[in-house]
Amino acid sequence: MASEFGILLTNQIYDQTYEKEMCDVIITAENAVRRVEVAGVHGYEWGATNHRLGLCEVENTKSIGRMIYEQIRCEGAYPIFPHYITDTLKYGKSIDRNDNQIRVDRDDERVRKIKIQPYFGEMYFSPENYITVFCKRQAISGQIEVSRSIIGRRMKYEESAEQTKGTINANKYRLLEKWRDLAYEQIEIERDNERCLTHNTDPIYQLIKKMRYGMMYPVHYMLNDRYKVVQERADMGVEKWLLQKIGRGTQRRKADDGDNDALLQLERMMSSEELERSVIESVIRFGSLYNAHAGKKTGDIPLEVLIKYCDSLTTFVHKKNREGGDNQTARDEIRRAVVKNIPSMKQENQMKVTPNIRNFLFFAYLNGFKRNNGVDIDPNNGTWSKHKAEVKKFLNEEQKKNENKPLKVLIDGAYISTDAEYGTVAHWVDWVVDIVMMTQVSRMIKEYNFIRLKKDQLISGMNKLEDGVKCYAYCLILALYDFHGRDVDGFAQGTRTAAIVETVARMFPDFRSEVSEKFGIDLAVSEESDELFVKKTMVSSFSDSGEMGYKFIFGWRKTDFKVETDYGEIVSDEVHRLYQAILDGKEWSKEVDDPEKYFVDDLYNRCPESIYVRNGVDPNNKIMIKKRGLVGESQRIFLRDLSHIGMNFKKLLLRLSSKRLHARGEHIQYHEIDVEDFKPCAIAELGLHCSTYIYQDLLVGANRGEYVKDAKELVWFDIANTNFNITRPFDRCWPSSCAEAELSLRFHLITKIFTRYRGERTSFVDIINELSEHGYVKHNFPSYKHYYLSVIQTVFEDQRAIDPLDFCAMISRNETRESTLKGFSMFTAIVKSERLIDTLFLNFLLWIVFEMENVDVSAANKRHPLLISHEKGLRLIGVDLFNGALSISTGGWIPYLERICSEEKAQRRLNADELKIKSWFLTYYMNLSLERRAEPRMSFKFEGLTTWIGSNCGGVRDYVVQALPMRKPKPGLLMIIYGDDGDARWVEWAMKNFTAVDGSLGFIYIDRHKLVNKSDFRVREMKIYNRGRLDRLILISSGHYTFGNKFLMSKLLAKTE
């Protein structure tokens, strides 16, 4: 007997309605989000879509970048339409794809069903049929002319006074004019369609996860804001700069730094009120807003104990006020008093005074000083002589530490050059003043039972500080040191200790080293950076007064180098050691080393921000710097192992004039560097320079509901392509266009590189020059799987019809990887071949394995083998798959493939040891297990990404998909799709991967206006009167099929385990 599946469409559930429990699905219009159309974009009132019980979505105003890359915290999330059902039908097994998520729903006791909230209302599902319910989004195709209008709009904006501020960037405008011409040429050859050609979310989704949806530009290595360049050296080369340390963090105000005002107010409070309870509480309150120095340590200092510490420590801060109101230490006053009591003498002369009648008053002063202070300061006696000897020894040691270059050090509260002859009148006066300071402060201090601090240390340290605010700030740190010990960092956020450390660090970034030096205590300084230069990007905070630094620019240029050569003298002995270790059967992970160890080349620096280091100080205590390595300013040097890749070093000077306004009209300022250095990701990853370039994504605008007409990131992407005389297509919206351009460019470059083993041995520079002259074929890959398979088939010259889903599933599994690849006759031939050139062709396995969809590589296991041809034969090197990037990058290994082998050795047969290495290499990659990348965190964001794409084109439609299992006469699956004024043709296209498999029973589309039946079942639409109200009822009759019970899906999946 046939059974029936009932779907009820009603406006509202009004009361206890038990007869409605008989329906399997109820669709109401309650809380439906109103559809709107703005400038041709179909969407919803987006503010009403936040946090509904459907696809987990945060506020519609959150940026798409934050939505994609952040861990969204909410009740749960629906997954993208899952593969595990079709895996069961198609393969008879369950493949772990990690695409399960916690569901967002609620049990409704009124109708005893489970409730969700798609945009078109509220839906209720019977529990037995609910486990296979999923959300789906359609990005609607918009008018293509709207997307193309960006060209004229952009050119007009770049010329506007609002953007240029009276200064036109000539290089940028020239490139934009070239881009405009290329864009119009591209439009001429495209098909004359009115609407966006395609919306394929998967390629964008995969490129985002691989961090390739955008472009790359050189990192800025800017001078650390703790230093500034001495003005007279600013125009010189970097190596000739003299640096001066900036003592206080707030003296150098940063652009867009809103915390400075609060910090300056806090300093004024310290200056006027010292460390009263209210000031201490303000310090803690300010620091608690941040957590840069917070950790997990507990055991906070009690507030009352901290106040008692400060009450004592502030008595060590001995200062007086001048009439003008400025703070000044008592040192100057005491110094003037001492000078009045000595005979008239030149300050630079050695301190010698003969006892006679003329100097009677001076010696009387010395005797009185000895009675009052207990110290003999007579310059003719042993105390002064002993002090001179100790200081001279100290000065000599400090100069030796500074590479025997003179510098100034602090002696008795004054700075003295280490090459000066110590013992002058001025030196004696400073010595006496220091003794007086120590004695007077000692009489004023309040005693406290310190645990670690010593009274003499505190007196001496405070006397060395001339800044009253710094004295008070350091009192707080000294209190923490005495209470906690040497390590005052790492306390949990919210603790007083963490807040105080945060506040003092923002006032005085070098407080750790200075407190240690001045007070002679062992305060931990491990967190304090010693870098002279720090990495910055175009969106970093820059000083309004300008910043200075440098950058590396890499590119390709034709040289005399030929790719048909072997690696020779530039290869280190480590390569031969690794070769022998693998022959001896040793484990790869224990033998492989840093890739730099395999080449004798000191041009490449794995820490480019540290290419300049300290070189001591000059006589005025200005820091001198020196260069490490051979790279010099304005030099272009070609890497010895990659002879077509040139490295150029340039000094940077960024001023306010480099600021630009955001094209989206938000009046957000940003710094823009030399746009001619921009590169598409596909091209940038052909060079080791990836480690000195940074990735800029195209995730701009809100995560849904905002139509981005243009953005600075999109301008940068287009300029990066224009730098190589290429452009993206304009027959689709910009999100899809940029993804298509990146994948098509990658397809072109990778296939050109690997087909060299079977054809002409071209260099990378030839490939890039050919690209710039003739462009590349623009493909339309429906998914990343299609792109992946197309590359492999092109390289292996295979023309079979292969299902991409099947192929990628087989490649991802160790058990079936080798057998799948041996389906390609060319692969089988190179595996059997004993020729050198065919063996080197096996390096394509790195691309096959690491460019799979969703692949993740552990940073602890990031080095893998690559084959090279050496003068002594076939060899191995370890390559780094990350290459300094946040994600897997081909830049860590592709550049080493440019050099192939010498022409006369290409057809050489391998010897026994080399054949053993080849076999080991093949086995390594056939059995290499890899994890899936980021799927548990990102899989549910697939539909959210589709919503963003639609928001930037023709709009969005919301759907709910239900998979209904059948058990007789054989297991099958019926797809039911619910929507609101949806597109049945799009639904048929979206379901094609599921309706095409064996076991599929077709689909039925239902919305409030129509019903489309493309299944093997009879569907009837009827009216039902329910307590005086007219509703709509849809009945699906099973015919000779039998609907599965509530356990059927579990039973189907259980068979595959």
From Swiss-Prot:
List where in the cell it is found: Virion
This entry carries the following GO cellular component terms, namely: viral inner capsid
Keywords of this entry: Capsid protein, Inner capsid protein, Virion
What functional role does this protein have?
Answer: The VP2 protein is one of the two proteins (with VP5) which constitute the virus particle outer capsid. It is the major target of the host immunogenic response.
The Swiss-Prot or TrEMBL record annotates one GO molecular function as: structural molecule activity
Source organism (scientific name): African horse sickness virus 3
**Gene of origin?**
Segment-2
Q: Which family does it belong to?
A: Belongs to the orbivirus VP2 family.
What name goes with this protein? Outer capsid protein VP2
The record ties this protein, via InterPro entries, to: Capsid_VP2_Orbivir
Q: Which Pfam families match?
A: Orbi_VP2
Please indicate which superkingdom the organism of origin belongs to.
Viruses
User: Keyword Acetylation, does the record have it?
Assistant: no
